[in-house]
Amino acid sequence: MAGYKKQHTDGPNSEDKAVVHFGGGCTGEIISAEGLVLTNHHCGYGAIQQHSSVDHDYLTNGFWAMNRNEELPCKGLTVTFIDRILDVTTYVNEQLKKDDDPNGINYLSPKYLATVADRFAKAENIQITPATRLELKPFYGGNKYYLFVKTVYNDIRMVGAPPSSIGKFGADTDNCCLLYTSDAADERS
């Protein structure tokens, strides 16, 4: 990811700082100080497909950028870091007491919780940048509330991917049961 900066929230060596949310539902790991992300081949498949053509069949033949100039930008792909997780239960309960919802179900409403998250961030002077995302989630049926403070990177570039013959070796039957595959793809955030 271009513009990647190492995150330090629970200590500089905290392993959870290396794990990212990759795209729409995968995970990845930061494996270098320059933001190199390792994820599964099937997670990077859309990015590989996006850059494949008749002349450059990266799905069949794989792809490896030999330098940063050869890295390929991946439109629409994001990598998200969770910078902090805050227990905001007391604050949310105070806000709910002031709520005039006649049905009393706002405690689970994502739209309502988003406004509460914004108010909390302002009240606590949480630094918000264009890359910051706040997500307030109810847990245990609304008995606990946690605010996830995230940084989203959207300048993601394809660095490497093995050929599908390696990345999907054994197809789903073997891969899901025995994991014989080299199910990996490299991106830079």
For each feature predicted by the language model, list its residue ranges:
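Gly/Pro-rich turn-and-neighbor structural signature
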Residues: 113-178
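N-terminal leader/propeptide and maturation segments of large enzyme subunits in energy/redox metabolism
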Residues: 1, 65-139
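Catalytic-histidine neighborhood of serine endopeptidases
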Residues: 38-82
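A conserved glycine-rich beta-strand in the N-terminal activation segment of trypsin-fold
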Residues: 17-34
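Start-of-domain marker
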Residues: 1-13
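Structural recognition of the beta-strand scaffold that forms the well-ordered cores
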Residues: 30, 37-39, 157-159
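Short, flexible loop/turn elements at secondary-structure junctions
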Residues: 24, 43, 160-162
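Conserved small/polar residues in nucleotide/adenosyl-binding loops
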Residues: 180-187
